[in-house]
From Swiss-Prot:
Keywords: Disulfide bond, Endosome, G-protein coupled receptor, Glycoprotein, Membrane, Receptor, Transducer, Transmembrane, Transmembrane helix. Residues 83-93, 152-164, 227-242, 307-334 are cytoplasmic. This is Atypical chemokine receptor 1. InterPro entries: Duffy_chemokine_rcpt. Residues 1-61, 115-127, 186-205, 264-285 are extracellular. PANTHER family: ATYPICAL CHEMOKINE RECEPTOR 1, DUFFY ANTIGEN/CHEMOKINE RECEPTOR. Disruption phenotype: (Microbial infection) Gene knockout results in reduced parasitemia after infection with Plasmodium yoelii parasites. Increased resistance of mature erythrocytes to P.yoelii infection. No significant effects on reticulocyte resistance to P.yoelii infection. (Microbial infection) Gene knockout has no significant effects on parasitemia levels after infection with Plasmodium chabaudi parasites. Changing T194A: In strain: BLG2/Msf, C57BL/10SnJ, HMI/Msf, MSM/Msf, NJL/Msf and SWN/Msf. It comes from the Eukaryota. Changing M256I: In strain: NJL/Msf. Glycans are attached at N16, N26, N32, N285. It comes from Mus musculus. Changing T268I: In strain: BLG2/Msf, C57BL/10SnJ, HMI/Msf, MSM/Msf, NJL/Msf and SWN/Msf.
Length: 334
């Protein structure tokens, strides 16, 4: 919206008259030329509205710290899942968990590319690649969590290796295609990787906003509604609720604010005050920062999910199985 360090000089009208001058704008007119108005108008609403970008160059430490913590956490949980002595039988959902860890790691790698203040990294190609990896990894994680919640109660997809592989390829392919609009619409402007104002790119930007709203906002609401209906109608368990659903808390506001911003840009929703526009710009920055934190939280959610699944699997061992193991031990001693 502009540079918040240099607010605009607003014009004021004398309430007792109908004249205003441009002396404060350093315009020199011969004989101090003035304009006559037929009525008392206020020019303040016509002044440009300048908003402060919260994610400017001063936020570079936040970007870098989030990236480092995300890569360390994602790498640690991925190593724990893929190590040879991991309890794959006790936690059969490990392929999905590994993909979520990979998605979180990819997002963490993309964060420095889009970090403000790193001018050396701000080439157009890197900007496009950064946004593509950023949103492709996020879309893939959302789709994996949603499909896992819907299909696992019926199919136990962790046990079906071929089905899991095909599902993963399809979901990652859909996520990669969904990330193309934002990659094509992004560019470098004044040292920042952003979406430049261009009518040629508006279709791509609106497509991206719609995809984000559908995946980040509509998908979790659909899961909650389906779960509620299944419980209310007593027609089966419905989507499997797990700690992984917390992931959507980091992205749900981002989808909501993006679609609202799209409505404002398309003049479908009108903001009549500069303060409203400033609040919207601030919310765009806040929700983007919140979504970035998911790369740190996701590995923790995966670790908690593995812990809960392991405890559930161990407690589900039948008593006859335990007794049989004890009898085998006694027979070996005799």
């Amino acid at each position: 919206m502009g540079n918040c360090l240099y607010p605009v000089e607003t014009l004021s009208l004398d309430k007792n008259g109908t004249q205003f001058t441009f002396d404060s704008w350093n315009y020199s007119f011969e004989d101090n030329y003035s304009y006559e108005l037929s009525s008392d108008y206020s020019l303040t609403p016509a002044a440009p509205c300048y908003s402060c970008n919260l994610l400017d160059r001063s936020s570079l430490p936040f970007f870098m710290l989030t990236s480092v913590l995300g890569m360390l956490a994602s790498g640690s949980i991925l190593f724990a899942i893929l190590r040879p002595f991991f309890h794959w039988q006790i936690c059969p959902s490990w392929p999905i968990l590994a993909e979520l860890a990979v998605g979180s790691a990819l997002f963490s790698i993309a964060v420095p590319i889009l970090a403000p203040g790193l001018h050396s990294a701000h080439s157009t190609a890197l900007c496009n690649l950064g946004y593509w990896v950023w949103y492709t990894s996020a879309f893939a994680q959302a789709l994996l969590i949603g499909c896992y919640a819907c299909l696992n109660p019926r199919l136990n997809i962790g046990q079906l290796r071929g089905f899991t592989l095909g599902l993963s390829v399809g979901l990652w392919g859909a996520a990669a295609l969904s990330g193309l609009p934002v990659a094509l619409a992004s560019d470098v402007y004044n040292g920042f990787c952003t979406f430049p104002s261009s009518r040629d790119m508006e279709a791509l930007k609106y497509t991206h906003y719609a995809i984000c709203f559908t995946i980040f906002t509509v998908l979790p609401l659909t899961l909650l509604a389906a779960k509620g209906l299944k419980i209310a109608l007593s027609k089966g368990p419905g989507p499997w609720v797990s700690v992984l659903w917390i992931w959507f808390i980091f992205w749900w506001p981002h989808g909501m604010v993006l679609i609202f911003d799209a409505l404002v840009r398309s003049k479908t929703v009108l903001l009549y005050t500069c303060q409203s526009q400033k609040i919207l710009d601030a919310m765009l920055n806040v929700t983007e920062a919140l979504s970035m934190l998911h790369c740190v939280a996701t590995p923790l959610l995966l670790a908690l999910f593995c812990h809960q699944t392991t405890r559930r699997s161990l407690s589900s061992l039948s008593l006859p199985t335990r007794q049989a193991s004890q009898m085998d031990a006694l027979a070996g001693k005799s």
